[in-house]
Curated annotation (Swiss-Prot):
Belongs to the DNase I family. Its EC number is 3.1.21.-. It is found in: Endoplasmic reticulum. This is Deoxyribonuclease-1-like 1. It is an enzyme of class 3 (hydrolase). It holds the Pfam family Exo_endo_phos. The lineage of its organism: Eukaryota, Metazoa, Chordata, Craniata, Vertebrata. The gene is DNASE1L1. Disulfide bonds join 198-235. The keyword Heme does not apply.
Length: 315
């Protein structure tokens, strides 16, 4: 009897289990984020430590909606995308940006940054704000999901102006109705810097909004979650609201990402990035297909299989 046989079988089992885990990367969550990047310009992203931090934030998400992109050159997002695609192999990433939006000289754009091997843009449009209800009308996007449960969803980003939070959030319900009818989709995420707290909107007025009273809407980033960087403030300005039974059934987690704490930044350092935390939702069971493996992982797996007999890993 080979006294090492048990060891060989045990080791072989671990090796095969490791390989199966590598191949079964499809069980991971799908993360959707919204981030007010605070006056994002070409000069800002050209600062190395700002770029490095932004890339680390974006690399956590499958889709990020950036707000307050005020770059008039059109070069900031491509530069950010280039560095993101060089970062850690989690890409490739692509982007989709709105035109510059605003009533006066000050204008912003929305920008979607997304992992193009996990999701694709199916449709998009700028909400036709004929009555000028929004300072920055939503730039609506429909995205595919690698899911049999939920093959696509719609994102409706909004950065409200602090002087008109309540009327803009009332009008956001009309945008929801418009997109639901246009694309026959009930699975919709409303997200962004709503300024829906503190001095901008009282709790009483917030709770009177149709988006709060109408059945079917789930405010995933709950009241009381601090989405601001400054220690002197505690406001839930940034929100993510989910509509649709299938979409809500996939919700695994939601909240704000405290990037200063995660990355070891002081408040002063963090404020050079933004005065807002990103907010995010994670959808479980969203991904069902095998994720692409890196070349190094494939080579390591093949080497392990080829060397198993020599290493005594075979039973």
């Amino acid at each position: 009897m080979d006294s090492s046989g048990g060891f060989q079988k045990h080791t072989c089992g671990h090796a095969l289990l490791l390989l199966l885990l590598l191949l079964a990367g499809g069980a991971e969550a799908f993360r959707i984020c919204a981030f007010n990047a605070q006056r994002l310009t070409l000069a800002k992203v050209a600062r190395e430590y700002v770029m490095d931090t932004l890339v680390r934030i974006l690399a956590r998400c499958d889709i990020t909606v950036l707000q307050e992109v005020v770059d008039s050159t059109g070069s900031a997002i491509p530069l950010l995308l280039r560095e993101l695609n060089r970062f850690d192999g989690s890409g490739p990433y692509s982007s989709l940006s709105s035109p510059l939006l605003g009533r006066g000289a000050y204008k912003e754009k929305y920008a979607y940054i997304y992992r193009s091997h996990r999701t694709q843009v199916l449709n998009f449009y700028l909400y036709p704000d004929e009555d000028d209800l929004f300072a920055r009308e939503p730039f609506v996007g429909q995205f595919s999901l690698p899911s049999k449960v939920l093959p696509s969803l719609v994102l409706v980003p909004l950065h409200t102006t602090p002087k008109a939070v309540e009327p803009e959030l009332k009008a956001l319900y009309e945008v929801f109705l418009d997109v639901s009818q246009r694309w026959q989709s009930e699975d919709v995420i409303l997200l962004g810097d709503f300024n829906a707290d503190c001095a901008s909107l009282t709790k009483k007025r917030l709770d009177e909004l149709v988006l709060r009273t109408q059945a079917g809407f789930h405010w995933a980033v709950a009241d009381g979650v601090d989405t601001t960087v400054r220690a002197s403030t505690h406001c839930t300005y940034d929100r993510i609201v989910l509509h649709g039974e299938r979409l809500q059934s996939l919700l695994r987690n939601a909240g704000a990402f405290d990037f200063p704490q995660s990355f070891g930044l002081t408040e002063e350092e963090a404020l050079n990035i933004s005065d807002h935390y990103p907010v995010e939702v994670e959808l479980s069971r969203a991904v069902h297909r095998i994720q692409p493996l890196s070349l190094a992982t494939l080579l390591l797996s093949l080497l392990l299989l080829l060397l198993s007999p020599q290493l005594g890993l075979a039973a």
